[in-house]
């Protein structure tokens, strides 16, 4: 490791520990030439995830953009900002574990809805109304009816917007359409 003070390439590791919840390694080093001490971090380099939007455009996955959308949906619901950050981190981890580097915005929306459904029904409805591009009150009523039915029959069911075009591959195995 190159010393930031004298640019010498030899250093010794004084201390090494896990950091950032096991996501990186923090190393305390000492330059063998100038004796200055410095800290380095070793992190996993993730391959970027590309999001395919509704209109077909592609953009890099931005966790902060997802978090902002969730914060808006969860205002005044009692879900803490830290909980939303944890959900976004979980979603990002799930996406990183996939072999495919492209994901549709619909798939991301489904993941968010799955988490919000467990946390708060109001947040779920708010997010679904934007994600599903609700056109009117009928869309809200249909989604509320679906929530009531799911409460009677517990399942892993996820709401699917009526105007969405999932291919067979992309459709979660237990998707319900609003009636």
From Swiss-Prot:
Q: Where are the zinc fingers (unnamed)?
A: 3-34
What's one GO MF term for it? ATP binding
Which co-factor is required? Zn(2+)
GO BP field: negative regulation of DNA-templated transcription
Q: Which UniProt keywords apply?
A: ATP-binding, DNA-binding, Metal-binding, Nucleotide-binding, Repressor, Transcription, Transcription regulation, Zinc, Zinc-finger
**Highest taxon in the source lineage:** Bacteria
Q: What is the documented function of this protein?
A: Negatively regulates transcription of bacterial ribonucleotide reductase nrd genes and operons by binding to NrdR-boxes.
Q: Give the family per the record.
A: Belongs to the NrdR family.
* Name of the featured protein: Transcriptional repressor NrdR
């Amino acid at each position: 490791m190159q010393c930031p003070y004298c640019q010498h390439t030899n250093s010794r590791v004084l201390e090494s520990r896990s950091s950032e919840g096991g996501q990186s390694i923090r190393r305390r080093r000492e330059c063998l030439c100038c004796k200055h001490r410095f800290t380095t971090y070793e992190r996993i380099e993730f391959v970027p995830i590309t999001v395919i939007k509704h209109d077909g455009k592609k953009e890099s996955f931005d966790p902060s953009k997802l978090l902002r959308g969730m914060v808006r949906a969860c205002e005044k619901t009692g879900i803490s900002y830290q909980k939303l950050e944890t959900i976004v981190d979980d979603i990002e981890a799930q996406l990183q574990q996939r072999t495919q580097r492209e994901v549709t915005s619909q798939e991301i929306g489904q993941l968010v809805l799955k988490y919000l459904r467990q946390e708060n029904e109001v947040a779920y409805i708010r997010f679904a109304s934007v994600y599903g591009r609700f056109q009117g009150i009928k869309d809200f009523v249909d989604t509320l009816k679906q929530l009531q039915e799911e409460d009677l029959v517990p399942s892993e069911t996820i709401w699917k917007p009526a105007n969405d075009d999932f291919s067979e591959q992309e459709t979660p195995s237990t998707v319900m359409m609003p009636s």
